[in-house]
Amino acid sequence: MDGNENPNPARTSLWRNARLATLREELGPLGIIEDGVIAVRGERIVYAGPEAGLPSELARADQVFDCEGRWVTPALIDCHTHIVHGGNRAREFQLRLEGATYEEIARAGGGIASTVEATNALSVEALVEAALPRLDTLLAEGVSTVEVKSGYGLNVEAELKMLRAARRLESLRPVRIVTSYLAAHATPPEFRGRNGDYIAEVVLPGLTAAHAEGLADAVDGFCEGIAFSPAEIASVFGRAKSLGLPVKLHAEQLSDLGGAKLAASYGALSADHLEYLDAAGAAAMAKAGTVAVLLPGAFYTLREKQLPPVEALREAGTRIAIATDCNPGTSPLTSLLLTLNMSATLFRLTLEECLAGVTREAARALGILGETGTIEAGKSADLAIWNIDQPAELIYRIGFNPLRERIFKGERILR
C-alpha cells in the first residue's frame, strides 16, 4: 500500500513479525517484546504482545502488514516547542558569531522583540504556513504529537492568534497538537518595568479568553530574573487552576529562583530547562509527579556550561523527558532524533532515559499518558517503524533518519 490510509472504525489491522520496544515499565528496560504483533481496531490498539498470545478472533484481521523483523516504538512526542512564530533570527546568530553581545543585539531591535514584531505582523493563515515546514520536519522523523506554545504575541489578540494557528495545524497534518498558553514569556516594551500591570492587563485576560475559546490545553510561564518572579507566576497559575487548566513552567534555566518548587506546589505537569535546579527542587518535583523536561538544543545553542543535575533527578526519582525547544532564538532545532543524541552526549542520559524521554515521559509531561506514549491495548495506535538493527541506533547516529513508516491513530503514513 502507498501513501496514507484512513482507518475504518470497524477494520482490524495487524502488524506482525515485529520487535517491539513498547516502553511499558512492567516489561523492563524499553519494554521489549521479541516476535511481537500489534492489533489495531480503528484508531486503537487492541493487542500488543507476543505472536503466540494473539487472540484467535484478532488473527482474522482485515489487513496484515509484515514488519519483517523491524523495530517498532511508540510514535515520538516533542513535548516543548515554539514552532508557531514569524520571522527568524539568522541575522542575530551571525552577529553573535561576530562578537556582538545579547544586550547589543537587543538594542539594535533583535532578540525576542524582533520575533514578537514579526509574529504580530502575520495573520493566522500566514503563521500556519510558516509553521508547517517545521512541523513537517518533525513528523518525518516519526513524531506524532507536538506541543506548541504561544508567547511571541505579548498582547491578548496576538497570543490568541498564535494558539488558533497551532490548532489549525492539527486539521492540516496527521498529528496531535497540544497547546500551551505562554503570555508570561516576556514583558513587551510598553510594559517594561511593570510586570504586574502586564499580567493584570494582558496575561490574565488573555488566559480567560483562550480558555473560553478552547485554545489552551495548559498554561506555561517563564520564571527567571529576566522574565517573571515566582510571585508573578503564582498569580498566573492561580488563575489557571481556577479555570481547571494544568500548568507547566520554564524554570531554573539561568539561575535558581525556586521555580521548580513553585511548579511542583501547583502540581505542574512539567518544569523545563532546569540547568540550575537544586536537590530540593528535584525532590519536590518527584513528590508532585512533575516531569523534568530537558532541552539540550538551547543548552548547545547558548554554549551553556551549567549542566542540568541529571544525577539529582535520578536520585529523587523525578521523571525525565526531552524535547527540541524549537524556537527562533535559542534552539532553532527541528530534529528530535538529533535531540536524542544531544541528550545522551551532552547530558549523559542513558538509552532508556532518552527513548522514554521522547515517548512515555513526554506523554506524561503533557498529561496524555493515558492516550499515547507506550504500545499497549487501549491506547491510540501511534507507532513508528524503523530500519534499524537495535534501538541504540536512534540515539547513536547523527544526521540519520531510519524511519520506515509512521502510524497515527491507526493510519499508515509511509515515507
Swiss-Prot record:
Where on this chain does N-formimidoyl-L-glutamate bind?
A: 152, 327, 329
Binding positions (Fe(3+))? 80, 82, 250, 325
Q: Which GO terms describe its molecular function?
A: imidazolonepropionase activity; iron ion binding; zinc ion binding
Sorted UniProt keywords = Cytoplasm, Histidine metabolism, Hydrolase, Iron, Metal-binding, Plasmid, Zinc
Keyword Transmembrane helix tagged: no
**Catalytic activity reported:** 4-imidazolone-5-propanoate + H2O = N-formimidoyl-L-glutamate
Kindly list the cofactors needed.
Zn(2+); Fe(3+)
- Short name of one Pfam family for this protein? Amidohydro_1
Q: Indicate yes or no for the key word Ligase.
A: no
Q: Which residues bind 4-imidazolone-5-propanoate?
A: 89, 152, 185, 253, 330
Pathway the protein takes part in: Amino-acid degradation; L-histidine degradation into L-glutamate; N-formimidoyl-L-glutamate from L-histidine: step 3/3
Q: Name one GO cellular component term.
A: cytoplasm
Chief location bin: cytoplasm
Q: Which Enzyme Commission number(s) are listed?
A: 3.5.2.7
User: InterPro entries annotated for this entry?
Assistant: Amidohydro-rel, HutI, Metal-dep_hydrolase_composite, Metal_Hydrolase
GO terms for biological process? L-histidine catabolic process to glutamate and formamide; L-histidine catabolic process to glutamate and formate
Where does the chain bind Zn(2+)? 80, 82, 250, 325
Q: What does this protein do?
A: Catalyzes the hydrolytic cleavage of the carbon-nitrogen bond in imidazolone-5-propanoate to yield N-formimidoyl-L-glutamate. It is the third step in the universal histidine degradation pathway.
Family note: Belongs to the metallo-dependent hydrolases superfamily. HutI family.
* NCBIfam families found in the cross-reference section: hutI (TIGR01224)
Protein name (record): Imidazolonepropionase
Gene assigned in the entry = hutI
